[in-house]
């Protein structure tokens, strides 16, 4: 194929990617098996055809398939793939008829026009939002360190409160929220379109902060209060203090211990990891419950944000317990590398998680920054079925405002926040891959998942079991 043909094909693919995935609405990567899809749906369809998979739907065979819940029902996802024309025998883009290509380009133009209209509408909002953030340079959160330094000696966490339902990681006290999240009575309400922070050029860079003022109704006192509350909540709900992590840094699993992990059955190691993930999620739930702004959201939105974002926060927090010098992570009291998780049969998931942790560590985030970024990831207005997405969005904007100031105080690199925001799709992708791997594991070991996995884990990542497999 000559150079001009390659360029034409690349240009065509780039144009096609303007159209969202026809299956789940995520960002598409081109035409796969005859339909415009994302990489996730392409891989799902390929695996379903290779394995001649037979899926069943536990509900009424009319499950909604979108970016957030596409992994919840494989039957309905596959049926949607087939209904929209996905096929192993589908023609490739270059072999389409002129009529098919014209129809496709008309759709591309329609989406491009819609995006242009959205950008014009958002530009006014971007200017207003930039004004909200702008005075962080001159006013800042100067009192933040002064007020927190007296509470946390040497920047380390104070002892966890010995309240009922919460415990120190090494104590024998009960875990929080063992009963899981109450999802009864949730109505599926169509999410209204919202403003995407990441789509606005230079919004979070230093140069976008001029001599503006806070938007009406927002004060620096409020931003300061939110930041202090989030940082305090984070420090009080981390499984390990930084001091403890430093002490454990070179406590690594021995060769014999690593061999023991590798010789475990796939079922046993999956169960072990599910327990550890659930343990970490319980701390994230407690973190969220201590955030004042989060608790002011309606209960429906609190639950939806936790269900869709808790694992993402666990992944962000993982960087605290990751040693980039030898690529090891803290697991069951000692550090170990990727080879420890070989028995899972999910090397790609483990690789992605480790790569993300290493990349996040390279930014050398402080505890303040991890706290604020974690809360921004959790309190995300683009989650499906939120009742009050605008309220969630406003809270997230205030968190990003505080985070931007803290970053500018700690880093010479003006682009640290932009780099953090750019990592959010990777966080989502790793968590989606976890969901896909769990579904594959469940197909071959349904009884293990149904009877031995923690109830909270099942409720969050395997909702079919949470309701019918107690």
UniProtKB/Swiss-Prot annotation:
It comes from Homo sapiens (Human). Residues 222-460 form the NR LBD domain. Nuclear receptor that binds DNA as a monomer to ROR response elements (RORE) containing a single core motif half-site 5'-AGGTCA-3' preceded by a short A-T-rich sequence. Considered to have intrinsic transcriptional activity, have some natural ligands such as all-trans retinoic acid (ATRA) and other retinoids which act as inverse agonists repressing the transcriptional activity. Required for normal postnatal development of rod and cone photoreceptor cells. Modulates rod photoreceptors differentiation at least by inducing the transcription factor NRL-mediated pathway. Isoform 1 is critical for hindlimb motor control and for the differentiation of amacrine and horizontal cells in the retina. Regulates the expression of PTF1A synergistically with FOXN4. Residues 104-127 are annotated as: Disordered. GO terms for biological process: amacrine cell differentiation; cellular response to retinoic acid; eye photoreceptor cell development; negative regulation of DNA-templated transcription; negative regulation of osteoblast differentiation; positive regulation of DNA-templated transcription; positive regulation of transcription by RNA polymerase II; regulation of circadian rhythm. Gene3D superfamilies: Erythroid Transcription Factor GATA-1, subunit A (3.30.50.10), Retinoid X Receptor (1.10.565.10). A motif (AF-2) lies at residues 456-461. It comes from the Eukaryota. Residues 104-117 have a biased composition (Basic and acidic residues). GO terms for cellular component: chromatin; nucleoplasm; nucleus. One of its GO terms (molecular function) is DNA-binding transcription factor activity. SUPFAM superfamilies: Glucocorticoid receptor-like (DNA-binding domain), Nuclear receptor ligand-binding domain. AF-2 (activation function-2) motif is required for recruiting coregulators containing the LXXLL motif, such as NCOA1, and control the transactivational activity. Signal peptide: none annotated. It is linked to Epilepsy, idiopathic generalized 15: An autosomal dominant form of idiopathic generalized epilepsy, a disorder characterized by recurring generalized seizures in the absence of detectable brain lesions and/or metabolic abnormalities. Generalized seizures arise diffusely and simultaneously from both hemispheres of the brain. Seizure types include juvenile myoclonic seizures, absence seizures, and generalized tonic-clonic seizures. EIG15 is characterized by onset of variable types of seizures in the first decade of life. A zinc finger (NR C4-type) spans 21-41, 57-81. This is Nuclear receptor ROR-beta. It is found in: Nucleus, Nucleoplasm. PROSITE patterns: NR_LBD, NUCLEAR_REC_DBD_1, NUCLEAR_REC_DBD_2. Monomer. Interacts with CRX. InterPro entries: NHR-like_dom_sf, NR_DBD_ROR, Nucl_hrmn_rcpt_lig-bd, Nuclear_hrmn_rcpt, ROR_rcpt, Znf_hrmn_rcpt, Znf_NHR/GATA.
